[in-house]
Amino acid sequence: LTKSANIVGATMRLNPHGDGAIYETMVRLSQGNEALLHPYVMSKGNFGKAYSRDMAYAASRYTEAKLMPICQELFGDIDKDTVDFVPNYDNTTTEPTLLPATYPSILVNANVGIGVSMASSVCPFNLSEVCETTIGLMKNPDFNALETLKGPDFPGGAARLYDEIGRAS
């Protein structure tokens, strides 16, 4: 495990979003169940509780963290010329234009955010169903994804009331 403050500093060398935003993201990525189905950060120390009114967590100098093994699937082939690299914000190093992920992160872990003044919210899907659907689409482009990808993986259960989503594009 590495001190969280060290990780925040290393991240700021690539993109200066500010230490608060970076550390808060680390805290969220360490939260299981409530925030993510599969957390990306293994944490040690008081990382607070996700989505509580006062998400009180200790300062980064008091906590430690490291990436979970699943994260290897997000950038495991990065050194194999699978993606392009561009200079970072101050031209001191380079960073990938995207991650060569072999793990369907957004579909499995969901996503909520605001970017370019547009809000987005993606519900989490079951990893087995996502993999089965992906394999089906690779084998047959006309594969009906709704046969295997029934819908979001809500912990309390859910029912698909109509199939209109199948025609969305």
Residue ranges of model-derived segments:
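Conserved small/polar residues in nucleotide/adenosyl-binding loops
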Residues: 168-169
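Catalytic phosphate-handling regions of large nucleic-acid enzymes and associated NTPases
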Residues: 1-165
